[in-house]
């Protein structure tokens, strides 16, 4: 029987590219972009994408009527947060003093890199845009077949700071070391975009399809 994956459509996120990447990673999966609570409840696993500003994402999720179904899914189903979808899992964001879903304890803060120079003498830019390495800080099924220190694609100005260091699954250096992937029980989330990260991103998505926490 096919595993069914609901990509949550609350009006914020690159849904089609996520769906296409999941279907390419595992053609046998039943991937759907969904905008109804019952479709989230019916799915075997859930992807929460997010792009733009966290205040807008949280507002749109609340207005969509899907927030309760996402929180319900987070208790029992494999759930993958991507980019702002990762940030939304936490308690609070400094971006617009925004309350998150509170599924993982911690906060979201902005890069404090103004005026700092990189090794080549150029200034750090915020947002970080481009490829960067992810060092795996814990063994996890979603890292299966993904080389440690592999390059993933990032576009962001904010990043998560988990209260519990054990929830950090990956770290990245951009001026300072920050948490770029988190994991706890049936939750996994990334600051980077797997769908924009070539073969290693597809591998992570394939691992998510087959993950049974």
From Swiss-Prot:
Its main location: cytoplasm. One of its GO terms (biological process) is L-histidine biosynthetic process. PANTHER family: IMIDAZOLE GLYCEROL PHOSPHATE SYNTHASE SUBUNIT HISH (PTHR42701), IMIDAZOLE GLYCEROL PHOSPHATE SYNTHASE SUBUNIT HISH 1 (PTHR42701:SF2). The active site is at 83 (nucleophile), 193, 195. It catalyses: 5-[(5-phospho-1-deoxy-D-ribulos-1-ylimino)methylamino]-1-(5-phospho-beta-D-ribosyl)imidazole-4-carboxamide + L-glutamine = D-erythro-1-(imidazol-4-yl)glycerol 3-phosphate + 5-amino-1-(5-phospho-beta-D-ribosyl)imidazole-4-carboxamide + L-glutamate + H(+); L-glutamine + H2O = L-glutamate + NH4(+). One of its GO terms (molecular function) is glutaminase activity. It comes from Burkholderia mallei (strain ATCC 23344). Residues 4-213 form the Glutamine amidotransferase type-1 domain. CDD domains: GATase1_IGP_Synthase (cd01748). Heterodimer of HisH and HisF. Pfam families: GATase. IGPS catalyzes the conversion of PRFAR and glutamine to IGP, AICAR and glutamate. The HisH subunit catalyzes the hydrolysis of glutamine to glutamate and ammonia as part of the synthesis of IGP and AICAR. The resulting ammonia molecule is channeled to the active site of HisF. Pathway: Amino-acid biosynthesis; L-histidine biosynthesis; L-histidine from 5-phospho-alpha-D-ribose 1-diphosphate: step 5/9. One of its GO terms (cellular component) is cytoplasm. This is Imidazole glycerol phosphate synthase subunit HisH. It is found in: Cytoplasm. PROSITE patterns: GATASE_TYPE_1. Its EC number is 4.3.2.10, 3.5.1.2. Keywords: Amino-acid biosynthesis, Cytoplasm, Glutamine amidotransferase, Histidine biosynthesis, Hydrolase, Lyase.
């Amino acid at each position: 029987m096919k595993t069914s994956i609901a990509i949550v459509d609350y009006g914020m996120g690159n849904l089609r590219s996520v769906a296409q990447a999941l279907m390419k990673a595992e053609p046998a999966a039943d991937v759907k972009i969904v905008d109804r609570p019952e479709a989230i409840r019916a799915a075997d696993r859930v992807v929460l994408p997010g792009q733009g500003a966290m205040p807008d994402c949280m507002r749109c999720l609340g207005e969509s009527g899907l927030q309760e179904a996402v929180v319900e899914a987070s208790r029992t189903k494999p759930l993958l947060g991507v980019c702002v979808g990762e940030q939304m899992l936490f308690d609070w964001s400094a971006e617009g003093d925004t309350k998150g879903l509170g599924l993982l304890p911690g906060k979201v803060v902005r890069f404090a890199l103004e005026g700092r120079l990189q090794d080549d003498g150029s200034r750090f830019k915020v947002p970080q845009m481009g490829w960067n390495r992810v060092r795996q800080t814990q063994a996890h099924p979603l890292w299966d077949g993904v080389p440690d220190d592999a390059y993933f694609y990032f576009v962001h100005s904010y990043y998560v700071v988990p209260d519990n260091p054990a929830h950090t699954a990956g770290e990245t250096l951009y001026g300072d070391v920050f948490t770029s992937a988190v994991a706890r029980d049936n939750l996994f989330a990334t600051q980077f975009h797997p769908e924009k990260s070539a073969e290693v991103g597809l591998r992570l998505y394939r691992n998510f399809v087959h993950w049974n926490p």
